[in-house]
């Protein structure tokens, strides 16, 4: 039987401002190793600041070695991801809901945007398994104080775009940075052809 499909899995609405559920793509001139060619999913954005996690920085640490109870529901490759440079000794978890499921009334889930939810790692993964497609667990996060991110966007460090639910659980063998750019209209999609090492071009 074919799996149900959700239109939002294929079409991301245009993003003009930062809000939960948007992506920050590192611009081609942002060469700082921590954030170079990163794709950051925004989890919180309010008057107190902004919090997000890097979606394309897998580590070599297996989830089973850190949070074994969550290994079964973790999306491949079932490793911890580096969410950012802040509080690397703490963990944050995102998941995508199965099509047709809702987070309302489900203990351990907090809605972020669309089918993306934040997961309480103290919850029982077996109880959440029927509701979610999978989880991604991040060590640390990326954070900005009030106004800090606005300044970085103004100097073109970041491109603000909308996310698809599939971006959260995408396998690291896929170039997420390039994939997100290629689904944008011209001329922005041409940025996906920017070489990783411009000195070799």
UniProtKB/Swiss-Prot annotation:
<dbReference type="GO" id="GO:0005829">
    <property type="term" value="C:cytosol"/>
</dbReference>
<protein>
    <recommendedName>
        <fullName>UPF0301 protein MSMEG_6921/MSMEI_6732</fullName>
    </recommendedName>
</protein>
<dbReference type="Pfam" id="PF02622">
    <property type="entry name" value="DUF179"/>
</dbReference>
<comment type="similarity">
    <text>Belongs to the UPF0301 (AlgH) family.</text>
</comment>
<dbReference type="InterPro" id="IPR003774">
    <property type="entry name" value="AlgH-like"/>
</dbReference>
């Amino acid at each position: 039987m074919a799996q149900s499909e959700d239109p939002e899995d294929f079409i991301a609405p245009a993003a003009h401002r930062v809000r939960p559920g948007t992506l920050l793509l590192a611009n081609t001139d942002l060469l700082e190793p921590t954030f170079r060619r990163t794709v950051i999913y925004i989890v919180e954005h309010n008057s107190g600041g902004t919090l997000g996690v890097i979606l394309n920085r897998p580590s070599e640490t297996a989830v089973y070695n850190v949070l074994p109870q969550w290994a079964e529901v973790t999306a491949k490759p079932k490793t911890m991801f580096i969410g950012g440079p802040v509080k690397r000794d703490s963990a944050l978890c995102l998941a995508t809901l199965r099509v047709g499921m809702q987070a309302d009334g489900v203990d351990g889930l907090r809605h972020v945007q669309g089918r993306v939810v934040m997961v309480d790692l103290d919850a029982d993964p077996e109880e959440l398994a029927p509701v979610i497609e999978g989880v991604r667990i991040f060590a640390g996060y990326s954070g900005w104080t009030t106004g800090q991110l606005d300044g970085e966007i103004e100097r073109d460090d970041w491109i603000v775009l909308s996310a698809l639910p599939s971006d959260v659980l995408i396998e690291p063998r896929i170039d997420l940075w390039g994939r997100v750019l290629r689904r944008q209209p011209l001329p922005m999609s041409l940025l996906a052809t920017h070489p990783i090492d411009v000195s070799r071009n």
